[in-house]
From Swiss-Prot:
The gene is glr-1. The lineage of its organism: Eukaryota, Metazoa, Ecdysozoa, Nematoda, Chromadorea. Command interneurons of the locomotory control circuit (AIB, AVA, AVB, AVD, AVE and PVC) and motor neurons (RMD, RIM, SMD, AVG, PVQ and URY). It is found in: Postsynaptic cell membrane; Endoplasmic reticulum; Synapse; Cell membrane. This is Glutamate receptor 1. Glycans are attached at residues 190, 220, 275, 333, 441, 482, 852. Non-NMDA (N-methyl-D-aspartate) ionotropic glutamate receptor. L-glutamate acts as an excitatory neurotransmitter at many synapses in the central nervous system. The postsynaptic actions of glutamate are mediated by a variety of receptors that are named according to their selective agonists. May contribute to a sensory discrimination between mechanical and chemical stimuli. Plays a role in controlling movement in response to environmental cues such as food availability and mechanosensory stimulation such as the nose touch response. Ubiquitinated. Deubiquitinated by usp-46 which prevents its degradation. Glycosylated. Disruption phenotype: Decreased frequency of reversals, suppression of hyperreversal phenotype of cni-1 mutants, decreased tactile response and increased osmotic avoidance. Overall, display increased omega turn frequency following reversals, however deletion in AIB interneurons specifically results in decreased omega turn frequency. Decreased nose touch responses. InterPro entries: ANF_lig-bd_rcpt, Glu/Gly-bd, Iono_Glu_rcpt_met, Ionotropic_Glu_rcpt, Iontro_rcpt_C, Peripla_BP_I, Solute-binding_3/MltF_N. It comes from Caenorhabditis elegans.
Amino acid sequence: MFSSFSFLNMFGVLFTVFNLTVVQPYPSHIIIKSFGNNEEVSRVALKAMEYTSDHINSRDDVPFKLAFDHRVVEEGAAVSWNMVNAVCDELKEGAMALLSSVDGKGREGIRGVSDALEMPLVSLTALSNDDHQQQQFGNLFEVSVRPPISELLADFIVHKGWGEVLVLIDPVHASLHLPSLWRHLRTRTNTSVKASMFDLPADEKQFEAYLMQFNMMRNNETNRILIDCASPKRLKKLLINIRSAQFNQANYHYVLANYDFLPYDQEMFQNGNINISGFNIINKDGREYWSLKKHLKTSSSLGGGDDVSVEAAVGHDAMLVTWHGFAKCLQANDSLFHGTFRHRRFFNRGFPGIYCDPLSDRSHPNRPFSSFEHGKTIGVAFRNMKIGHKEGTLTGNIEFDRFGNRKNFDVSIVDLVSNTKATFNSKEVLAWRQGVGFFSNRTVAQHSRKSQNDHKDNQVIVLTNLVAPFVMIKRECLEMANLTECQGNNKFEGFCIDLLKLLADKIEEFNYEIKLGTKAGSKQADGSWDGMIGELLSGRAHAVVASLTINQERERVVDFSKPFMTTGISIMIKKPDKQEFSVFSFMQPLSTEIWMYIIFAYIGVSVVIFLVSRFSPYEWRVEETSRGGFTISNDFSVYNCLWFTLAAFMQQGTDILPRSISGRIASSAWWFFTMIIVSSYTANLAAFLTLEKMQAPIESVEDLAKQSKIKYGIQGGGSTASFFKYSSVQIYQRMWRYMESQVPPVFVASYAEGIERVRSHKGRYAFLLEATANEYENTRKPCDTMKVGANLNSIGYGIATPFGSDWKDHINLAILALQERGELKKLENKWWYDRGQCDAGITVDGSSASLNLSKVAGIFYILMGGMVISMLAALGEFLYRSRIEARKSNSNSMVANFAKNLKSALSSQLRLSVEGGAVAQPGSQSHNAIRRQQVAAFLPANEKEAFNNVDRPANTLYNTAV
């Protein structure tokens, strides 16, 4: 009994210790409850949150997963009460954080539950940002991911110097907290700002009539209008009506009091002579933006113009805030939630779930009212966190003040101002930071548009850079730079130079001066640009005409013309050696398997013909002898069958043919077979031996990515690097990680360095560059590079001009005219192919070429081998026959002398072979020798008959063919 008890105790202790050692430091999942309504804003935010949650859970490096669940709360008169009931129902199953995308009374309901139960709440709507109000009614457990806009609007009004504003308030969806706006205005200016408020109609169909009536009332006054509308759908409808209004809007300036000024809206007002300003907080440079955009596009949840709306971006960032908040808690205390999950259920302070009303828990009547035991810890972690672009946020830097509001976030302000002297509105993009205001330099891309008349008296400064064959310095100008012909624009040549000449012919008074720039330009940390884009933004140039690719980052700060050339990223490798042919290349049109089958068919058909000829009575030949007897013979012996079948296969004839039906059927089938085989072989042989192929080690980007033998790289810091870095395509992401991890680095500083590396690495390095440069270099000596595979993407080269430049429309029309006439294609052929230094020659696909000895040497070897074997066989027959003659002569002789008889036989056979024939007179030695030879082998009659028939006329000729 004692030993049994001790054993059980020991087993229990070991079991307890084992359980303690295998406990995971982190919970397997964190329960997140989300609440929204059926409105478009909430649905778009939900799509983004679901995507982000799934993306986080799909990663292998995360210590815990997110158990995300969403509930739709019906709108109505009692929306606040409905929200409270919905939240309380969900909390009964357990939750560790709440997410809310609702505003108004519904938001107040969920905030009340969060505050009462100390449940962390991440809100997708902006807080009031009113310190006084939040000190009295604030929720210490709530953080808002959507930045407040009151401070920004106040700074913008002060920046513009406006003394009066009008506020158009959407009665259905309004988000602007006016008391907070006035509070910020009072702290920023001593000048009073007058404000008037107007309600928009609830029915979207009445927007047009409302605007007309509004204009009749305010036509003679300056109107600075703040539009407070949180619904993207209603806002878009309102903007369309503003854009299409027929009255003069020069005295109007609209400001969108939200962060929904999408590129689609900017394009709509680009040439409308309407003053409008908007704000944007979405960072479009990261891979996360393009991945989310692709997902939302698949689910038809994108905003206007197929862009990610601010609701989707905030939903994405709200999920990141939630995950990083819990990660921060667990990093500080990895055992924080050890008692939270038991038997796969959520427990709070020893009881399952969280109840708003403890009396409703009939399973636990003694349950007290208790808040979430970890709520304060999680709430503090939320408010103390700081994440940014590195963690994948779309709305920039995320950190919160003591009230849960966003702080230190950046906003770009797009200000479109009508210009009566130009076709397009002038555009100014300002940078603003919360707590700081407008940056000291203020301008991310600030430049005014001048009218065309301002340019007529001056030359158009055109920037370009030296990239062959777009722009090059003439060879004679390199050697003798002081020549008169090498001054100014005359020293340049190339595709872009010819394009400028064509544009000058098409555009009136387009007098240009070419200046050399350095690189295209890239965005700096402070928002400014270097390179030719920076020169354009600073006003020191009027246009950039070069191999400048059009991308969204550059499009934000400059205008591009219609593409004058389309290209894409391609792969350059060293041209492989031509395929080497073996001496038996003539056998390669048919596989080894086919050759074996032909040999088996040859033997099999020969056997079949032999058998049917033996069994068919029509193949036997009966001949009467001179003595009255009969001889029965069959021409199709085994050797003759093999010879007949081989001759048919070689398309030759023989002296024997089958006479029976069965033999002819077998022969016809074999002839048909050989006809098809020989015809197919001839066709394949002609194509094979006259087509030179180069076996490229890779043929596509997929081949390049899945191998490691050939390294590959790109030019660092250019548009190609941006393509791989921010691509959402999995294979391009893998290639980018590979290139970043290589030591020594595979990145190069210029195209010239990358091309030289391709040539010097003996086929072990591939360079990814734009197809235009690839194709051009492939036509230049030493002609040892080639392009493989299709282009990875499609991009265009365009002419860059400042925003609203008068030249943009003229350049666009000229480029379209040149495209329609085929002038641009002629220029491309001129500079890429007509001046090529390499023969069209051989490509990867192959091209026709004449036969050479290396391809058909095997045929000559077989011919020579056949001749040698034939001569050896003839020698063997000669010796064999001489030996037989000597043996017979030795047996008939009275005195046996085999050596002498062999010598005589060899001499006789040699004489016949050399002379080619002889006339033997009766009684002569030659006559007797021939008679013996006939008797021995050649004559079919017996020996006696042979001797009786040897008496013939003296002039009978016996040759070696007998």
